């Protein structure tokens, strides 16, 4: 029995090492994740963990393209610099860990991988670059759910028409260096184009009971855009 436990421990260690082999992070990042998870474990079980972790990450410098730092796609864990998407992704990964009583850095990495990539496959073309694609995939996994519905306040419909990445490949370092990836990105854009999402027009938002009952603390909010080829301009947490 002792030998079996020892083998099991070694196997688990090897699995953890393998999981982190494709990750890109510093010791500061892993220490911060562990500290945040420890803080989360001390909160009441019915706490709003999205809001708790969102507040804990407020103030981190906003830096764009923090995922574009390697010649080969790797799972980037960077809690020293965030953009709007990585902010939401890290908050969600921390929340899922705490809700499911997962307490290790490897657990966090696993959730972040599943959140960021379709089917958890760490590959540039599997990364959920367009946020409407991100919404659909994370809804499928049960990590989030959409609150859009017909009628007020979701009175308008967005028909997605994406193509910005393939038309502006030179703006994306990993596409510019690997033009062979364009075909797969174009296919993702084709599948996403035509999908419809209901939304709340900005001009209609007021401080009323309708909106207060619709948008709750901790909800993930996506701001759509009219910019050609894109679906959203910004995301955040209410």
Over which residues does each language-model region extend?
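C-terminal soluble interaction/assembly domains
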Residues: 219-238
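Short alpha-helix capping/helix-loop boundary micro-motifs
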Residues: 200-211, 224-225
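Positively charged n-region of N-terminal signal peptides that target proteins for export
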Residues: 1-7
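Acidic/His-rich structured neighborhood in mature extracellular/periplasmic domains
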Residues: 62-198, 216, 222-223
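Sec-dependent N-terminal signal peptides
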Residues: 7-16
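Boundary at the C-terminal end of the N-terminal hydrophobic targeting segment
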Residues: 19-23
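Sequence/structural signature of beta-propeller domains
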Residues: 46-58
């Amino acid at each position: 029995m002792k030998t079996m436990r020892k083998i099991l421990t070694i196997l688990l260690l090897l699995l953890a090492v393998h999981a982190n082999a494709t990750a890109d992070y510093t010791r500061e990042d892993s220490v911060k994740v562990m500290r945040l998870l420890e803080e989360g474990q001390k909160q009441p079980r019915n706490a709003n963990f999205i809001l708790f972790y969102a507040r804990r990450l407020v103030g981190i410098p906003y830096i764009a393209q923090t995922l574009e730092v390697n010649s080969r796609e790797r799972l980037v864990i960077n809690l020293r610099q965030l953009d709007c998407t990585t902010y939401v992704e890290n908050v969600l990964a921390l929340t899922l860990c705490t809700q499911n009583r997962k307490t290790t850095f490897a657990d966090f990495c696993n959730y972040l991988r599943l959140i960021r990539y379709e089917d958890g496959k760490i590959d540039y073309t599997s990364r959920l670059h367009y946020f409407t694609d991100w919404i659909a995939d994370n809804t499928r996994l049960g990590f989030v759910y959409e609150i859009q519905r017909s009628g007020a306040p979701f009175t308008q419909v967005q028909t997605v028409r994406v193509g910005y990445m393939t038309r502006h490949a030179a703006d994306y370092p990993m596409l510019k260096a690997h033009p062979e990836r364009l075909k797969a990105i174009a296919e993702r854009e084709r599948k996403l184009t035509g999908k419809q999402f209901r939304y709340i027009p900005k001009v209609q938002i007021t401080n009323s009971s309708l909106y207060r009952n619709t948008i709750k603390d901790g909800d993930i909010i996506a701001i759509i855009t009219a910019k050609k080829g894109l679906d959203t301009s910004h995301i955040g947490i209410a």
